[in-house]
C-alpha cells in the first residue's frame, strides 16, 4: 500500500522546501527557538486580533531558524525516548505493560511535536517569567497593556505579498498541552488527506485513520496513556494479560492493518486500542523520519544533530535515514 503519495508531496512542497533554505546547528538550539525570538521581541510588527491572540510579522531569517530550532529540540527528545523504549523491551520481555505503553506514548508524543514544527505550527507553554517578557514586548509595540495566554498554539505562514516575510498566528489553546498536540496533529493528517488523490491508496488509508480519530477522539493516545498509568484496575488487567506491552502489538509488515480493519460500530477493547495506538504513532514516526530525510536532501547535507547527540553518548543511538514508501 502506497501510504505517502500526493498528499505527502503537498506537505513536502508547502513546508519542507522553505524550511530547507535555512540551517541551525546543535550549539545554537538553546537560543534559536520560538520562545527566544518572542522573548527578545524579534518580530517587526504585531497586531492584536482578539483577546490574547496576535498576528506577528517576522523576517524569514529570524523565524525559520527559530522554527527549525524548536523542531530539533522536539526531535532530540523523540530520539532519546525511542532509543530507551526500543532497547528496554528486548531485555525485559515481561516488561510491565502499563509502563511500556506510557513509555511508548512519550516517544510518540515527541514525534508528534516534531511533526507539528515540520509543518510550521506547534504548541507552546509560557512560564510566568517568559510570559512577562513577551507581554512587555507586545505591549510596548501596541502602546497599551496586552498579554499572551499561558497555553498557546502558533501557526506560521509565508506572506505571499512581501518577499522574505512570515506571519505567526499566536493564539490561546482550548486544551492542555497533550490534548493540544494531538488535536493539531489531527489537523495535519486532515491536510494530507485533503490533498491526497481521491481514489489513491494514500486516501483510502487516511480515510480509515480519519474514522479511527473520529470514533476514538483525536486525543485517544493521551487518553490511553492516562488510563493505563493512573486507573488502578489496569494493574489487574496487566497481571491477567488483558493488556500487553505496546511493543508486543506490532504486526511486522502489516502494521497499518488495525487501522484499515477498524469498524466504527464494533466495541474497541483495550488490546485493540493499543494496536490502533501503535499503528497510528508508527505512521507518524515514519512520516517524521521521511520529512527530515527530505529536509536533509533538499538542504544538501545532514543537519549534524544526530552526530552531536552521539558525541555525548557512550552507546550511540541508531537513526533511521532511508525514506519509507510502502507499508
Where are these predicted regions, by residue range?
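Terminal alpha-helical segments
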Residues: 1-327
